[in-house]
């Protein structure tokens, strides 16, 4: 079982009241890998609740995958990693690396080693392939990052998780129509 992000700024206690009940209704008591694209509250606070309540909530997180950001001083990122390390195995991923889980292959497209001005532009971008299904997860990257990752995209995608919740500062027309095949 793999999750990518899990949080909300609109729903209070999203882990306890939305994510855990959803997982339990599907018979899921364990998340093998929780992939964190970046540490904004709307991407992690539900997963933090799951980790904190694993003894009483009944859902355990085995591993957390976070972007490898060397020399990164963002307080929320460092705090999240330090808290998670107490209970959970932390794995780091960087651009160009692959993970395989059975028939599922995930390639990390971003972040690379380039220094970014905008904190959201450090978001992990993942290409996931499962049989004929292909998905692109973009975190909260801005339109400035989109041209940097276009050459790494792997053919047509069945599904796109639009960058930054579809905000006007991301998901440029060129990104969607040129070469990526959405």
Residue ranges with predicted function:
Residues 1-182:
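Non-globular, low-confidence helical/coil segments that flank catalytic cores
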